């Protein structure tokens, strides 16, 4: 794998970072200026595109537990836990903005857009994965195209809502991504985001094992810090990124991964359920969900 040489923080550009963990393929760094946690070295843009070209057919290959995770992206049924999650996220969007034109960046198979359409949204999607976008068009009959959001954002389209579920952690330039999302908002529009929470029970336990072993026990960390995720946000750093992009938080909450979507041994599932119980009590849930809108005075496109 080739890597860019510049180790500056992807959010603030700071060059001063401390080492949090050193694991098999990369280091986990803390920016001393803005506190963003990020991986180093990071893959090149070409390698990033290759990673996601077959994501929905192969999953995130370095994590066997995600083998079946993407299978839930194909079935629009009330019993599907992913559909239930999307309904909750749409509830949050609709508390801030009534349905209108909706763009889902990284829309994948189109399941979220199909759920949104039933609720009165006018859906549109964009994704780099050709197999997924084909499914969205043929199975869900959605207006979805392949390609890069950066190119799309310059074409003057406007939406009442723009969503990016689990995309910001894949970005090498998160503030620029969020700024482009803001510029594509119609007046009064909203942005919806989800991403892993770096300050989670998973990092806490894996980090404890790493430090107690003098850095020799890294396997638990390698389940959490994976090469497809370049950035790891906390609620505070995600709010900071939104603010740097001219967006103001309307709602931000912590959530837990649905273990039913993961491929786990019975013992691992039981252990994670216990950890997630602790997470609920301590505020160390492993996911972040946010809704934001253009800050006062921030210019939209």
Locations of the language-model features?
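S-adenosyl-L-methionine-dependent methyltransferase catalytic module, highlighting the catalytic core
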Residues: 159, 172-184, 190-296
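Structured helix-beta-strand junction loops
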Residues: 119, 139, 187-188, 245
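Catalytic acidic motif of RecA-like/P-loop NTPases
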Residues: 169
């Amino acid at each position: 794998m080739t890597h860019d040489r510049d180790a500056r923080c992807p959010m603030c550009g700071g060059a001063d970072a401390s080492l949090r963990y050193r694991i098999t393929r990369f280091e986990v760094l803390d920016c001393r200026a803005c506190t963003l946690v990020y991986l180093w070295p990071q893959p090149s843009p070409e390698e990033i595109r290759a990673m996601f070209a077959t994501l929905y057919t192969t999953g995130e290959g370095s994590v066997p537990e995600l083998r079946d995770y993407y299978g839930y992206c194909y079935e629009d049924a009330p019993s599907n836990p992913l559909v239930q999650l999307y309904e909750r996220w749409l509830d949050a969007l609709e508390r801030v903005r009534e349905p209108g034109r909706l763009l889902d960046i990284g829309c994948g198979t189109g399941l979220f857009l199909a759920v949104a359409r039933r609720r009165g949204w006018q859906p549109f999607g964009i994704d780099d994965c050709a197999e997924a976008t084909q499914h969205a068009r043929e199975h869900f009959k959605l207006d979805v195209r392949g390609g890069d959001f950066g190119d799309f954002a310059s074409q003057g389209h406007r939406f009442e809502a723009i969503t990016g579920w689990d995309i910001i952690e894949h970005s090498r330039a998160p503030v620029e991504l969020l700024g482009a999302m803001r510029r594509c908002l119609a007046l009064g529009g909203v942005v919806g985001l989800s991403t892993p929470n770096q300050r989670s029970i998973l990092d806490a336990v894996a980090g404890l094992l790493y430090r107690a072993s003098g850095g020799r026990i890294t396997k638990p960390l390698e389940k959490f810090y994976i090469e497809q995720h370049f950035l790891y946000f906390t609620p505070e750093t995600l709010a900071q990124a939104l603010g740097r992009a001219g967006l103001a938080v309307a709602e931000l909450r912590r959530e837990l991964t649905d273990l039913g979507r993961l491929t786990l041994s019975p013992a691992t599932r039981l252990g994670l359920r216990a950890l997630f119980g602790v997470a609920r009590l301590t505020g160390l849930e492993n996911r972040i969900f946010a809704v934001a809108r253009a800050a006062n005075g921030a210019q939209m496109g």
